[in-house]
């Protein structure tokens, strides 16, 4: 009985909510991390114009299928979407806004690796319309980063975090917990260092 009441009220609330959350997948990476099971691929080169056209065509199709909605969030994931040209990011954001409009306070997130090459693009990514970056630190221990197959070291990760905080209104980061042999005290030290 309580479940039926709960389902009816949730269903009514969902029917009244015309918001839309978009996920945009960029499947390319510079290298494949050994722990990653996401749809991601290492490629020497990517036809950027072809991918941009495909993303915009897919977005236009979805806009026709889902009219009358407002975008509450866009999440660029991957792969490594910080490798996406900022012009493509801006084009997708612009097409989404033109198709649906944005809800107040729309959050537009892009996942990024903390390599210095990618961190140097944070200003351009923010100018494209991204207001939150999710930084894949994964660890703040150089031996753990090597074990995880990451391309950056601790210092580069912390510099990228600082750069991200200067470029974006909102920043989050990933730290992998319960790595083989990791003690709780080590996790706490890494977390405290990232939050400092």
Regions found by a protein language model. Give the residues of each.
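Local cysteine-cluster metal-coordination motifs and their immediate loop/turn environment
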Residues: 25-40
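N-terminal [4Fe-4S]-dependent radical SAM core
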Residues: 1-22, 67-69
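Sequence-level motif detector for i,i+2 pairs with an aromatic at +2
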Residues: 17-19, 33, 71, 105
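Short glycine/proline-enriched loop/turn "hinge" motifs that connect secondary-structure elements
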Residues: 16, 26-27, 163-165
């Amino acid at each position: 009985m309580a479940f039926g009441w709960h389902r009816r009220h949730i269903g009514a609330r969902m029917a009244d909510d015309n918001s839309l959350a978009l996920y945009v997948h960029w499947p390319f990476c510079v290298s494949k991390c050994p722990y990653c099971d996401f749809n991601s691929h290492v490629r020497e080169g990517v036809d950027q114009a072809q991918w941009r056209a495909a993303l915009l065509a897919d977005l236009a199709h979805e806009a026709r299928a889902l009219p009358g909605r407002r975008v509450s969030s866009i999440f660029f994931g991957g792969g490594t979407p910080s490798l996406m040209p900022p012009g493509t990011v801006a084009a997708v954001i612009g097409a989404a806004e033109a198709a649906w409009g944005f809800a107040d306070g729309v959050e537009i997130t892009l996942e990024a690796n903390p390599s210095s090459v990618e961190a140097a693009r944070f200003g351009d990514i923010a100018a494209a319309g991204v207001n939150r970056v999710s930084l894949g630190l994964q660890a703040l221990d150089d031996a753990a980063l090597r074990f995880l197959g990451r391309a950056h070291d601790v210092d580069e990760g912390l510099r990228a975090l600082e750069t991200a905080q200067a470029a974006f209104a909102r920043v989050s980061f990933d730290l992998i917990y319960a790595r083989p042999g990791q003690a709780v005290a080590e996790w706490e030290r890494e977390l405290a260092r990232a939050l400092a």
